[in-house]
Amino acid sequence: MTDGEFRRRYWHLDFLADLDGVEEIKSDHWSVHFKGHQPKAATLKIADKVDFGEHPFLEHFKYLKSVAGDTLCKMTIPSPSMLHLICCVRAEEYIPIERYQDMKDLYYDIAIAYQKVIRAFYDAGCRYLQLDDTSWGEFCDAEKRKTY
């Protein structure tokens, strides 16, 4: 059972923006083109050390678990690579903060944050945590690869 992601404005930005050190910012346009309805554009930036602390998605999961009884509950979150893709690869004017002048430090902090994420969901009773990753499509498209 899932919550259908109905509490979210965006399938990916809401989770990532609530990580410590990450901020949601307004944007004039999306870095990808949507067909049909065009939601308000937004993006993310890394403003400080990336980490995992208090996060509203844990409460979302706990609520789902409380109403699901013995039914297995699935929680979905964006993969760690989505944070890097949005903040560093797709960002038109990406300038790393002082802490992340060496990209290895960013990768390390993202990895540690996600270890904490997975542990926190596990400790809350989550046994089905799905990491959604649409970044693979970026590398399968020859036109997208040219931009990197």
Question: Which sequence ranges carry the predicted segments?
Answer:
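Domain-level signal for soluble alpha/beta catalytic cores
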Residues: 1-148
